[in-house]
Amino acid sequence: MKKNVVIFLVVALTLGAMVLIGGCRQPVPPKAIVRIVDTNKQPVENAMVIIKANNSDSAHTMVYFKDETKSVADTQYTKSDGVLEYEFKYESILKVEATKAADRQNPFVRRGMGVLVLENNKTTDVTIEINEQTVFN
């Protein structure tokens, strides 16, 4: 009888330790890679990229990046590779708007839109194609 109690206690303690060790892992905050390309699938340099919440008309809307919080929206510009990388605090769904001003090769403003669906432990990779026909509402 004593032997059964000892075996039961050892098994219970082992299972309890396994549950505690395995259940305490914090999720990795979501990350995103946004790629801006033209209609020829070439990267776009100096495109203005705005990330904002779906209901960004509210003055209380925030975008929670890993190291800072921005009111309503965050604006950055792409480098020559057309890529921007972000780290966020929370899972969320955000709108992405990209705009490239007119230049010698393209006499019209080009725009594109996309959506980031951010999940913990994942890096979301989104490619947004900009063109002359896209209109922001």
Spans of features found by a protein language model:
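Short, ordered, surface-exposed loop/turn motifs in non-cytosolic proteins
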Residues: N40-D67
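Extracellular beta-sheet/turn segments enriched in Thr/Pro/Gly and aliphatic residues
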Residues: M113-N137
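Short, acidic Ser/Thr/Gly-rich low-complexity loop/linker segments typical of extracellular
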Residues: S58-L84
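A short, amphipathic beta-strand motif
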Residues: A32-D38
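Bacterial signal peptide processing site
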Residues: R25-P27
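A short, solvent-exposed loop/turn motif at the edges and junctions
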Residues: I93-V117
